[in-house]
């Protein structure tokens, strides 16, 4: 193996790890050669009401596409996360919660969590929620967000969690798509010292004339702040649960029954509802959580992701709780009120495993390591990275300053669509290289292909595809199976196309190079450029807009918008700021353009297609080698854009 920047598995980790390198090789070969035998055995890690007899029934044929795992088995996800732990660890802590203000702390045992989930499940049933109904959850990072999810799973309802930073329009589009009759929210959220008007945003979303299905809004009293109230529709959480029974029988669900929807950005049009089912997802989330983080009973596990993202679903809720872990939930942001907060939380709660994002690591790095002078960190054993490729400088800083050079880093690559981690080191098995996601998890078969779909061998670079299914894979786009087929299986026949590019080095390690479609990765969160463009063009003074990502020191990628104004409109700094606020209101703060460049024209082919590769290069200040511009209707547009670019190095 090439030794350049190679970090070997620490001896103490290797000696006690669940999997060493030899075991990894053996298990991986078995998982690929005999997936039915491998997954049939490992699916026993969760409790089945009716055991399955068939393991894998999948087809990647785009004319006849289907994905089924364990499909004749039945189970309940809530029971797997709660009930099965009561006898052996009912009094163990399931959730440690710390508020945005560190003075607010709460510990919830498995027995207490079970009772709360049952009460809320009974309340949902009393409000008329039935098996298969989609319940929309728009909550802050409080214990009750997890309670709401598990209560839905308990009664067979499908939860659709919306990130608490999204705008009323984003909420509305998800409610409409899911036809939700019931919403769950809080009066306000608290994040970074600021109050977020969650109920106010819900009210605004529900005031839209095209939102017609919602009958009930359950509101958690988080801050006690003033809220508008719609009699008959709005109900307080504490009132609907008051007196509700603390036992609730679980609904027996088929392995292929939906567990949740989670909307993710596509390269075109509206966000798509990624549908995950119950059996395969839970097997995969729990198994990856245990093996990737080398989780040992009794350890405190902290995933810093918001519950509104897939990482929060798989590695804050379902994976860890199915494994009987103690999870830490932090309401705020880990660098508020100062960059020292992350270290303080780790020390205060003796966190053993930390799973966070490169964007936070880069933000802490920019503030300086002096903020960690008083950080002990001896409790930390394993650290993870998620959301986007981590640059080697940030990896090393994380390893040295947070991990004190003794914690293995698992740099994990996966997607909302994959349900769980696909390419990752295993702490006791994989020597790591800063910036590389390394090797595939069990049962995962990655390949690199050229633009014609030919498989590339050896050390090379190409489009990242997956050759066969795994249990955690999404099953469809909610209500639009054709979009599922078109998005993931039409580009390269017989393969799942990830939308990412990657290179494979001489050791077979994978390095993710980023999106190859029109999706931007901002602070580890995916945004479709089409969404941001649509928001800009909705403004009366904007004639046309093109949006691309560009390298950003903190966020990984920033949002760079080229805007053509309507005839006669003056391009002013005031208008630029107005457009930034406009997008923020339309989609959410995450989508706010970092840079808006006025453009009298955009580079288009004669057929009118915008050539984004030129825009990406200009935004990245890579102007010396733009490539062939002969297909453009007006090549002079390029010179004008270069001349007025905003992201200059000089």
Swiss-Prot record:
Keyword vocabulary terms for this entry: Acetylation, ATP-binding, Ligase, Magnesium, Metal-binding, Nucleotide-binding
Origin superkingdom: Bacteria
EC primary class: ligase
Record-listed CoA binding positions: 191-194, 311, 335, 523, 584
Protein name as annotated: Acetyl-coenzyme A synthetase
Recorded GO CC terms: cytosol
Keyword Protease among UniProt keywords: no
Biological source species: Shewanella amazonensis (strain ATCC BAA-1098 / SB2B)
């Amino acid at each position: 193996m090439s030794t350049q920047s190679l970090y070997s598995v620490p001896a103490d980790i290797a000696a006690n790890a669940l999997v060493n390198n030899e075991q990894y090789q053996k298990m991986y070969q078995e998982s690929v050669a005999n997936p039915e035998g491998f997954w049939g055995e490992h699916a026993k890690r969760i409790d089945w009401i009716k055991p399955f007899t068939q393991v894998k029934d999948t087809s990647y044929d785009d004319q006849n596409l289907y994905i089924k795992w364990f499909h004749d088995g039945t189970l309940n996800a809530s029971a797997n996360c709660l009930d099965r732990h009561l006898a052996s660890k009912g009094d163990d802590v399931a959730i440690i919660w710390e508020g945005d203000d560190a003075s607010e702390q709460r510990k919830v045992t498995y027995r207490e969590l079970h009772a709360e989930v049952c009460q809320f499940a009974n309340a949902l049933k009393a409000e008329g929620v039935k098996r298969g109904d989609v319940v929309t959850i728009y909550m802050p990072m409080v214990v009750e967000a997890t309670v709401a999810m598990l209560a839905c799973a308990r009664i067979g309802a499908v939860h659709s969690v919306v990130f608490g930073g999204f705008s009323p329009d984003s909420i509305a589009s998800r409610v409409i798509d899911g036809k939700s009759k019931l919403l769950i929210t809080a009066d306000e959220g608290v994040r970074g010292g600021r109050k977020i008007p969650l109920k106010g945003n819900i009210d605004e979303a529900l005031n839209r004339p095209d939102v017609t299905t919602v009958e009930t809004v359950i509101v958690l009293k988080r801050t006690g702040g003033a809220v508008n109230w719609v009699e008959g529709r709005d109900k307080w959480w504490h009132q609907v649960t008051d007196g509700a029974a603390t036992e609730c029988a679980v609904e027996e669900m088929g392995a292929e029954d939906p567990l949740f929807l989670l909307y993710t950005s596509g390269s075109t049009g509206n966000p798509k509802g990624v549908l995950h089912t119950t059996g395969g997802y839970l097997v995969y989330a729990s198994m990856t959580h245990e093996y990737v983080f080398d989780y040992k009973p009794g350890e405190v596990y902290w995933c810093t992701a918001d519950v509104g993202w897939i990482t929060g679903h798989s590695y804050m809720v379902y994976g860890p709780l199915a494994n009987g872990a103690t999870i830490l939930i932090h309401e705020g942001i880990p660098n508020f009120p100062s960059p020292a907060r992350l270290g303080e939380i780790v020390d205060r709660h003796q966190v053993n495993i930390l799973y966070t994002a490169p964007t936070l690591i880069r933000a802490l790095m920019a503030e300086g390591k002096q903020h960690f002078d008083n950080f002990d960190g001896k409790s930390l054993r394993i650290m993870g990275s998620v959301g986007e490729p981590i640059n080697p400088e940030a990896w090393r800083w994380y390893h040295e300053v947070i991990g004190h050079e003794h914690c293995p880093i698992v740099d994990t690559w996966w997607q909302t669509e994959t349900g769980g981690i696909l390419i990752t080191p295993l702490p006791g098995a994989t020597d790591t290289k800063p910036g590389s996601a390394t090797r595939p998890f069990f049962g995962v078969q990655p390949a690199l292909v050229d633009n014609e779909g030919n498989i590339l061998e050896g050390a090379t670079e190409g489009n990242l595809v997956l050759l066969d299914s795994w249990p955690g894979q999404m099953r469809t786009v909610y209500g639009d199976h054709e979009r599922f087929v078109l998005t993931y299986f039409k580009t390269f026949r017989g393969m799942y196309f990830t939308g990412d590019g990657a290179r494979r080095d001489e050791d077979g390690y994978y390095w993710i190079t980023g999106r190859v479609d029109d999706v931007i990765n901002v602070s580890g969160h995916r945004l479709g450029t089409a969404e941001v463009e649509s928001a800009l063009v909705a403004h009366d003074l904007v004639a046309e807009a093109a949006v691309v990502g560009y390298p950003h020191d903190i966020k990984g990628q920033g949002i760079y918008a080229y805007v053509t104004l309507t005839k006669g409109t003056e391009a002013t700094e005031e208008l630029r700021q107005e457009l930034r606020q406009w997008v923020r209101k339309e989609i959410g703060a995450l989508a706010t353009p970092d840079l808006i460049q006025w453009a009298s024209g955009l580079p288009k082919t004669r057929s009118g297609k915008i050539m984004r590769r030129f825009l990406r290069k200009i935004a990245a200040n890579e102007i010396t080698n733009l490539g062939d511009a002969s297909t453009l209707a007006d090549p002079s547009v390029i010179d004008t854009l270069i001349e007025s670019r905003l992201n200059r190095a000089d």
